[in-house]
């Protein structure tokens, strides 16, 4: 899980979602997991 100031999609499988007021990226590739914070 990468914690970044700005999250972006890395590939076409990445999905931007909001959980508990946090913007997160979920993907089938675990390296692409990110959250904003």
Swiss-Prot record:
It is found in: Plastid, Chloroplast. This is Large ribosomal subunit protein bL36c. GO terms for biological process: translation. HAMAP family: Ribosomal_bL36. It comes from the Eukaryota. It holds the Pfam family Ribosomal_L36. GO terms for cellular component: chloroplast; ribonucleoprotein complex; ribosome. Transmembrane segments: none annotated. Disulfide bonds: none annotated. Belongs to the bacterial ribosomal protein bL36 family. Keywords: Chloroplast, Plastid, Ribonucleoprotein, Ribosomal protein. The keyword ATP-binding does not apply. InterPro entries: Ribosomal_bL36, Ribosomal_bL36_sp. One of its GO terms (molecular function) is structural constituent of ribosome.
